[in-house]
Amino acid sequence: MKVRELREKFPGLAQECYGRELVYLDNAATSQRCVAAMDVLSDVSINHNANVHRSVYKLAAEATKAYEDTRDFVREYLNARSREEIIFTSGTTFSINLVARTFGEKFIGKGDNIVVGESEHHSNIVPWQLLCERTGAEIRVLPITPRGDYDVERLRELVDAHTKLVCVAQISNVLGVINPIDEIVAFSHSKGAKVLVDGAQGAVHLMVDVQKMDYDFYAFSGHKMFASKGTGVLYAKKELLEEMPPFLGGGEMIGTVSFEKTTFAELPYKFEAGTPNFNVIPTLKPAMALLKETMEDAELTENLESINRYVYDALMADDRIVLAGGKAGVENRIPLFSIIVKGVHHEDLALVMDKMGVALRSGHMCAEPLMGRLGVTGILRASFAPYNTLEEAEEFIKCLNRAIDILL
């Protein structure tokens, strides 16, 4: 597939910004939506708009089928053993909080510890802090190496017989560095600890086989994968889910209810209380199918690799710029670049480049502990997707140079 052909599936890319062609480079925050996903959203919302799992009439049956067919698709996509291991949520943040409130509340207590990575997004830090405040457990911080990936040798010192859970991202949303998850999982399991992997960035760029990778928990968001907002997924091993108490109480997650006793539904519905976001969840299927197609397409893969090499080399060659995680090299990273420009505030850079038609993220990236490690309050981030072109990468570097010249 040609990149131009792929771009036609994303009408949002064709718009202008301040009279210039939009160069959208905030894909790590959220991707643009593909037409196929929006068509499904429109179809379900107009033609099959009925609550799922509750009624026998035709519209409800059709809505339920669309919802549950999506679960089957996600199970196959991740190579999970069972559809019961796929929980739909609103996003990665909700998924991680679900694990903290269920697995955490039941299995983690005073005297136990949780290992959390230094470069994690706040959504994989704060839920564990709150859990430790409630239970008296301890958080241990797994540092990054000078390259920006997690320090496996330090992990061997941190994980002990009291470690119940290790929480790490597949790929940092700031550094773009691919972490040594296989080693982390293998060592953690050898000590009896479970592992939660934040796949918010990883699921976008890497094919995932949860059985082969032996993840205990895996969380990601469809809105970064061409689907609608509100399309979160939590994968968890069935044997863990069976032992975990419900997170929220209400409709759908019950077996029977009386004032004397309530029993709970079978998996996965025990963790899907209330009316689900039934009109957007089905957008996961066409969106993730398209994403998989891009990962398997040689021409599109080569295009992203070319972008990665070009931008990496250009940033590393400029002595005015510090590329966070640059020491990891180009081979162990995705095309996500967080930069610090000496003497220039990241917000000013973002504002100037916005007027040039380049959409970038600025700020602390919801990773303040990592900002502290880097010695800054914020950065400027450019993140590329399969529909971005090498010409857009060149435009990014050209506009960045112009913006720096204006601001210095």
Question: Where do the PLM segments sit?
Answer:
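Pyridoxal 5′-phosphate
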Residues: 1-408
